[in-house]
């Protein structure tokens, strides 16, 4: 019987860097997490994962089986470098090929959700053409994901195109496909001028996972928990009352810290205390 406990995961970049997934999952288990979210970012090292051999993919599956710690989701931020909205046909084609490889990788290793970065372009100037190309690229991507039975889920971003659940829902309605859903980041959502609780309620029925981090207006990374603007207890209460029962993922970038495990444990305790206050988990 599946546990009724709220699944709590940790982002790969919060844990010590390296390519040994068995060690990473063992550490996550020691720290009390149910799952780890993989990062495939714009660096060559992490992009290379999409070209892993059959044996390398099987090693990840074996590590999950041995530890009991799942890798159910991938944060695919590589499209910053190879955006689907690029006006350069070669770059856009690379972006679509990355998407194809990511979906195939997910299918092979059991990843269920690929979180997408909501940028039409990132390092270039956006315009009507980049937005049109982005929409078309999403349509092609969702068609591929549908055939593979892998969910693509749009993150709420640090970027105006996709800085609210309402905007992401526009794409969900446009695509009208069950394999395209939403993966809000309550930090990013709170850093903009949004009615955060109304936005969370609007997304219910489409939210497949939630990123948990703190932010300040204009500062979207590395804000220590409790020092930003996010009202965590209210967000957790709203999600619970709205019927959301899915996973929460603590997003941190402490892989290069002096003691990443200690940083993660501190954040875990802080977040779980707020979850307990909101009635999501039992108090420690």
Swiss-Prot record:
Q: Which UniProt keywords apply?
A: Isomerase
Question: Known catalysed reaction(s)?
Answer: L-ribulose 5-phosphate = L-xylulose 5-phosphate
Task: Please list the GO terms describing molecular function.
Answer: intramolecular oxidoreductase activity, interconverting aldoses and ketoses; L-ribulose-5-phosphate 3-epimerase activity
- Disulfide-linked positions: none
Q: What does this protein do?
A: Catalyzes the isomerization of L-xylulose-5-phosphate to L-ribulose-5-phosphate. Is involved in the anaerobic L-ascorbate utilization.
Alphabetized NCBIfam families for the sequence: hxl6Piso_put, PRK13209.1, PRK13210.1
Q: What is this protein called?
A: L-ribulose-5-phosphate 3-epimerase UlaE
Where does this protein come from, organism-wise? Salmonella typhimurium (strain LT2 / SGSC1412 / ATCC 700720)
Q: Which gene encodes it?
A: ulaE
């Amino acid at each position: 019987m599946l546990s009724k406990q709220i699944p709590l995961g940790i982002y790969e970049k919060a844990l010590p860097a390296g390519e040994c997934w068995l060690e990473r999952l063992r550490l996550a288990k020691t720290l009390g997490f149910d799952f780890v979210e993989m990062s495939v970012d714009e660096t060559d090292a992490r992009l290379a994962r999409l070209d892993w051999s059959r044996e390398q993919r099987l090693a990840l599956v074996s590590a999950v089986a041995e530890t009991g710690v799942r890798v159910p989701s991938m944060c695919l931020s590589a499209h910053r470098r190879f955006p689907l909205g690029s006006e350069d046909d070669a770059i856009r084609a690379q972006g679509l090929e990355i998407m194809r490889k990511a979906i195939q990788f997910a299918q092979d290793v059991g990843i269920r959700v690929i979180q997408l970065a909501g940028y039409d372009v990132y390092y270039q100037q956006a315009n009507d053409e980049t937005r049109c190309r982005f929409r078309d690229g999403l349509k092609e991507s969702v068609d591929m994901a549908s055939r593979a039975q892998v969910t693509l889920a749009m993150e709420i971003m640090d970027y105006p195109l996709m800085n609210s659940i309402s905007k992401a829902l526009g794409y969900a309605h446009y695509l009208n496909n069950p394999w395209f859903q939403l993966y809000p980041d309550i930090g990013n959502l709170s850093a903009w001028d949004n009615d955060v609780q109304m936005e969370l309620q609007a997304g219910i029925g489409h939210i497949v996972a939630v990123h948990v981090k703190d932010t300040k207006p204009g500062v979207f990374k590395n804000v220590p928990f409790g020092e930003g603007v996010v009202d965590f207890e209210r967000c957790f209460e709203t999600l619970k009352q709205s019927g959301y029962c899915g996973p929460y993922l603590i997003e941190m970038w402490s892989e290069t810290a002096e003691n990443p495990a200690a940083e993660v444990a501190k954040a875990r305790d802080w977040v779980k205390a707020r979850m307990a206050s909101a009635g999501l988990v039992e108090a420690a």
